[in-house]
Amino acid sequence: MTNFKLKIASRRSKLAMVQTLWVKDQLERNIPNLDVSIEAMATQGDKILDVALAKIGDKGLFTKELEAQMLVGHADIAVHSLKDLPTNLPNGLKLGCITKREDPADALVVSKKNDYYKLETLPEGSIVGTSSLRRLAQLRNKYPHLVFKDIRGNVITRIEKLDAGEFDCIILAAAGLKRLGFESRIHQIIPSEISLHAVGQGALGIECKSDDKKVLEIINVLEDKPTSQRCLAERAFLRELEGGCQVPIGVNSNIDNGQLYLTGMVASLDGKKLIKDQVIGNINNPELVGIELAKRLKLQGADKILSEIFEEFRENKN
């Protein structure tokens, strides 16, 4: 039987390649006569490293180039960290599969020269590195005595900057650290009570052409239903708020006894305004749960906070 050829578009960063190679391996293990190849490339977000992510804009920073390859027929699927994939996709493309989630929490990584191992024990004036406005807003709200500094680059580059003495600690996604073998550098898994994680964090999203039934059937073997239900609720929450990857919006989701528990928050950039709420809903209608939570936060003033943030973004670009 002739092998079916499948080409994956991927970012070329170390973490992206680890994730894409995992997808390749799992597909070839589960689908007989499948020949998978990888096309690795740099995205806009990979190339612009001297500007804070929020100042660049967030519409497909890490995905556009991969999507272009699919739309012109040069790739069949694209593997993304789901947190980087916008909730509104280009015409002709869809989120075809969500894989089993790694730990979605944020993690604290401390400089080797320090012996402070938790956020709450960091002394006043400690320099904390993060490129995420979501983390920044929540941590400013909880720890106003700390100093926050932007940090760019891939996971390995950020750890090198930390060890070179530029920061006392940095905040990264626990999932990325674990996938790259840096679990021993995690000093604290940050509780959701302190920092809600990004929408989709810890899961991989596989994007493909909407009408490619053969490819959709192939990638379905990697679908993890509980992860998918949680992430679809999170993405619906973000979409309803009309937020993006670089806006201070955080979530936490769990499934218990057939019920979906979704917590969400919206914060101002300085962390002084923070609105948080939870919705419990039907696990079989995850998007409705996300939409309901977004509506609740809007009623509490989330719209006003987000409008102020977008206005500030526009002023900074001019």
From Swiss-Prot:
Example GO BP: protoporphyrinogen IX biosynthetic process
Entry keyword Transferase: yes
GO cellular component, one term: cytoplasm
Cofactor note: Binds 1 dipyrromethane group covalently.
Pathway it works in: Porphyrin-containing compound metabolism; protoporphyrin-IX biosynthesis; coproporphyrinogen-III from 5-aminolevulinate: step 2/4; Porphyrin-containing compound metabolism; chlorophyll biosynthesis
Pfam families in the record: Porphobil_deam (PF01379), Porphobil_deamC (PF03900)
Cofactor(s) the protein requires to work: dipyrromethane
PROSITE patterns according to UniProt: PORPHOBILINOGEN_DEAM
Superkingdom classification of source: Bacteria
Any one Gene Ontology molecular-function term assigned to this protein's record: hydroxymethylbilane synthase activity
Misc. remarks from the entry: The porphobilinogen subunits are added to the dipyrromethane group.
Family the entry assigns: Belongs to the HMBS family.
Function: Tetrapolymerization of the monopyrrole PBG into the hydroxymethylbilane pre-uroporphyrinogen in several discrete steps.
Protein name: Porphobilinogen deaminase
